[in-house]
Amino acid sequence: MKIIRKIVKSCKDDEMQKPNPVSAPPDDDDLWLPPPEYVPLSEMTGKKNMRNFCINGEVKVCSPNGYSFRIIRHILSSFEGVYSGNRRMIGLVKVVIGLALSGAPVPDGMNWVYKIRRTLIFQWAESSGPLDGEELEYSQEITWDDDSEFVGLQMRVSARQCHIQGRLWCINMNSRACQLWSDMSLKTQQSDEDKNTSLLLE
């Protein structure tokens, strides 16, 4: 056990703040949860409260014994309560983390690294979202440890407004990203002025 503990410590990032522990997942945690209410985006027609963001996102999964998405989903279900970043951009962070984890990981020692670098279009509901010109630098670690297994998520997201043509963030309703957004309780609603647009409520 001491050897495992030493291994675990070696794949943690000393620069990260003290991680937030998460309790063990229930037996039925692997059940699929429906995604939040939204419709697939086609083309932005409404320009109200719309922002283009240049995004860099990284999620590093640290686990000496491997990991399953059941545990990752359980860790992310606590995201709303432990998020330590700018609350005006929590919706953006949830979207980026979901999209990053939907990609293919790159092994890095005992870690698996998921990265996303993209320009994304977001549209927020009235009085929601970041201030004009506001930027984000967010990093946090959330862990799950039950003395027999350790899984840690190291998350980094940077976002700045830019004028590069952005892509729409919403993808296939049955994708892994939608499951992760559901786990993180992503809050959205359909736009009144554009039925093909989802507005972020956070």
Curated annotation (Swiss-Prot):
Q: Which GO MF terms are attached to this record? A: structural constituent of virion
One Gene Ontology biological process: viral budding via host ESCRT complex
Q: Where does it localize? A: Virion membrane; Host endomembrane system
Q: Which GO terms describe its cellular component?
A: host cell endomembrane system; membrane; viral envelope; virion membrane
Determine the domain of life of the protein's source: Viruses
Membrane disposition: Peripheral membrane protein
Motif PPXY motif mapped to chain: 35-38
Q: Which terms are listed as keywords in the entry? A: Apoptosis, Host membrane, Host-virus interaction, Membrane, Viral budding, Viral budding via the host ESCRT complexes, Viral envelope protein, Viral matrix protein, Viral release from host cell, Virion
Give the principal location in a single coarse category: virion
Q: List the InterPro entries.
A: Rhabdo_M, Rhabdovirus_M_sf
Q: Anything noted about its domains?
A: Late-budding domains (L domains) are short sequence motifs essential for viral particle budding. They recruit proteins of the host ESCRT machinery (Endosomal Sorting Complex Required for Transport) or ESCRT-associated proteins. Matrix protein contains one L domain: a PPXY motif which potentially interacts with the WW domain 3 of NEDD4 E3 ubiquitin ligase (Potential).
Extra remark: Most abundant protein in the virion.
Q: Which family is this protein grouped under? A: Belongs to the lyssavirus matrix protein family.
Listed under subunit, the entry gives: Homomultimer. Interacts with nucleoprotein and with the cytoplasmic domain of glycoprotein.
Task: Please explain the role this protein plays, according to its UniProt record.
Answer: Plays a major role in assembly and budding of virion. Completely covers the ribonucleoprotein coil and keep it in condensed bullet-shaped form. Inhibits viral transcription and stimulates replication. Plays a major role in early induction of TRAIL-mediated apoptosis in infected neurons.
What is the name of the protein in this document?
Matrix protein
Organism, scientific name: European bat lyssavirus 1 (strain Bat/Germany/RV9/1968)
